[in-house]
UniProtKB/Swiss-Prot annotation:
Its EC number is 4.98.1.1. It is found in: Cytoplasm. Signal peptide: none annotated. Catalyzes the ferrous insertion into protoporphyrin IX. Keywords: Cytoplasm, Heme biosynthesis, Iron, Lyase, Metal-binding, Porphyrin biosynthesis. This is Ferrochelatase. The gene is hemH. Pathway: Porphyrin-containing compound metabolism; protoheme biosynthesis; protoheme from protoporphyrin-IX: step 1/1. Belongs to the ferrochelatase family. Fe cation binds at residues 184, 259.
Length: 317
């Protein structure tokens, strides 16, 4: 029987897991490497993670000291398993406390393994990092991967209906709205290495926006250097539109977590409100029945990648 691996970013379940979560994230060379020699990378970013832990803990305090992404991913895995009538194992990339259980479950599995990273758009830094994680730890277990689904008809229709439901609940029509579609940012050096992320985000945005008025922007810049533009922060500071409502859609994130619940809700939405706009923030699709059904269709109809080395960020030596 085929076994499915549902992979997400992970997030601290309790405040005590914030330091280890941040350390795992920032010491991942697929995320923060590239310009720094490998011998220096881990000690440098271990130090940075320790320095940033208090500030990040203050941000998580707005969420009750934890991220909902763990529970939402677990629930989604259970519901997807019922929909597919097949085993679904969860994986939380930067929640290291859960890794041994995931690896043990995969080692015990007897069937084919298909990985499903919960990221609509492929990037070396996230989906590539997840693929590398398993190539390095269980090379004896061949895996196939669904690497992206940002223009899959089921994802597009799911997002359109989800946004429409949100507008209906607010008594708003799309003609009165300017849509701000926000996705995670990425350093330009990744794009220059051949990362397809920017093009996939643009293609996905084009498929979603239709005849509506809107913009694609990039959030969550970290560190120095050139990143994809325009940034969500800059758009919120400078946007001029005659539309009655700004609808913020974090469509690069299928799960609400710190980058939606803190960064968007507590940093960017207030910027727009202070400038006199009426703002609607569309929640992530999370564990909705519509998303479970759409994801099952995506799993059944998407191609599976098995030649994996070209999908990984070139390593600096």
């Amino acid at each position: 029987m085929t076994v499915y691996l549902l992979a997400n970013f992970g997030g601290p379940r309790i405040s005590q897991e914030i330091p280890s979560f941040l350390h795992a994230l920032l010491t991942d060379q697929d995320v923060t490497g590239g310009r720094i020699p490998p011998w220096l990378h881990r000690p440098l970013f271990s130090y940075i993670a320790k320095r940033r832990a208090h500030r990040v803990a203050e941000q998580y305090a707005y969420l009750g000291g934890r991220s909902p992404i763990f529970q939402d991913t677990e629930k989604l895995a259970q519901n997807l398993s019922q929909e597919l009538q097949a085993p679904v194992i969860s994986f939380h990339r930067y929640l290291t406390e859960t890794h041994q259980d995931t690896l043990a479950a995969l080692r015990e599995s007897a069937g084919d393994i298909i990985g499903i990273p919960l990221f609509p758009h492929y990037t070396f830094a996230v989906t590539g990092s997840i693929i590398r994680f398993f190539l390095e730890r269980i090379p004896e277990k061949p895996m196939a991967w669904i690497t992206h689904f940002g223009v899959h008809p089921q994802f597009i229709s799911c997002m359109r209906e989800h946004i429409q439901d949100c507008l209906i609940a607010q008594g708003i029509v799309a003609e009165d709205c300017f849509f701000l579609f926000s996705v995670h940012g990425l350093p330009m050096r990744h794009i220059r290495l051949g990362d397809p992320y920017a093009k996939q985000c643009q293609d996905s945005f084009n498929a979603l926006i239709g005849e509506s008025e809107g913009v694609l922007s990039f959030q969550s810049k970290f560190g120095i250097g050139e990143w994809l533009v325009p940034s969500t922060k800059e758009i919120c500071q400078s946007l001029c539109t005659k539309k009655r409502y700004i609808v913020v859609v974090p469509f690069g994130f299928v799960s609400d977590h710190i980058e939606t619940l803190y960064e968007i809700d507590h940093l960017y939405v207030p910027m727009l409100l202070q400038r006199g706009y009426r703002v609607v923030r569309v929640p992530a699709i999370n564990t909705s029945d519509r998303w479970v059904s759409a994801l099952a269709s995506i799993v059944k109809s998407s191609p599976h990648e098995t030649i994996l080395e070209p999908l990984l960020m070139p390593k600096r030596r």
